[in-house]
Amino acid sequence: MPRAEFAEYDAASPAPRNGCTEDTRKAILDTLRMWASDNTATKVYWLNGMAGTGKTTIAYSFSEILNDNESLGGTFFASHLRVDTSDVRCIIPTICLQLAARKYFPSLLHLILDAVEDNPDCKSWRIGKQFQNFIVKPLTAAYRDTSKIVFPVIVLDALDECSDQSLVAELLSVIFKHSTSLPVKFFITSRPEIRLKESFAKPWTHSNFILHEVEKEIVKADIELYIKGWLNMHNSSNDWPPQAEVERLVNMSGTLFIYAATVCKYIAEKGTPSMSQRLSDVVNSKLEATSGVTHPLNILYERILDAAYASTNERERKNIDTILTAVVYAYNPLSISAIGDLMEIPIRHIEAALSSLHSLIYIPSLGPDMPISSFHASFYDFISNKIHSSKYYLDPCISHKHIAHQCLGLMNRVWSEKAKISYLEERKCTEISESLAYACSNWTIHFTYKDVGEPASAKHVATCGNLWLT
């Protein structure tokens, strides 16, 4: 049965997740506590908000609260950073196994395993059939055998990051259809995309909270606590950070927590000669939230990239472009080593390029063999949109074609009898490098992205065929 192992809220995801800073978001978390403990409340709660308003952070903290109260049914934190965590077909299998493992309903695990054994072709099922066989039937039967009073809560975060929004709409439809008769609740977060808003069009079926409509003064107070906490953590001087500059930074953040988080990372970036100077530079710039919800974030991203590209030569600029292409458009996060192999850039050049991008890209401290990724989905939105990113725009079609050719080039370079591998997921070949495994698994996906065009020359296919078909 397909499932996403990195979808649980506390999993070691490519970009680490965290809960809310202490004493922030108290109102919404208190509201969610009351909803979770009230069996007469609606079975579905939708937290929606624009990009960067803190939905995932709230969902993480709420999951922690539920777990501490022994009322967490399961979590699926969707993310575009991995194929499985963006696949809607993985949500129900992942959730039902978590719910069964928590043993709120003693007979549930046995019932689900029986359902899987009886239906080996379940991977190809439609969402409605999955939900009926792995949630509705076993959960209804298991509930008869328990005295559970408080309904466990299933947390589904960032559904807007799933790759097929038509399947998300299908999932929401079956949740609404069956939720009133099930002994579980559903907490769902997403951006207010049009298709998702249509799914939540009937207000009597759910509770909802619009995060970007919270009173601005409440959000500003929370953002101020966050900024002070972060900057104090990196500099504990008595007069740091200056209150006037904190207030200016709070005003610049508007209601965007991701703006405050990105600015703080930028100010405290490793190797920064002067945090005070960076703070002063930021607050004296023109990055206010003057128009549009994400407008200030786009300007901030542009400012950080301006600094990263400053004083670079042509080769260094090309390296940054290529690295960002791999980080933003790879279907799974790659390590620095794998990016070096795949995109043909020495590791020392990658590390040099990334040194000024720590506020945009998560780079683990454990070394070059750990995957790196963008901190937030809004950076993908920025870099892939020509209107938003202007001179830093990385065309998706050109980028996918570039990666596809690099995949084939790598396969061609390392081809040998020893390097033959199976394309089948079941075969574990530890001698195959991360970059080669990625290339063999994903070159066709990159080539089939929208208008990329013909997959490759006959010569490439003939040369590389043995690697990915053997």
Regions found by a protein language model. Name each.
Residues 321, 380, 437-444:
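Alpha-helical repeat solenoid scaffolds
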Residues 440, 444-470:
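Short, well-ordered secondary-structure microsegments
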Residues 1-404, 409, 419-430, 457-469:
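Conserved NB-ARC/NACHT P-loop NTPase core of NLR-like innate immune receptors
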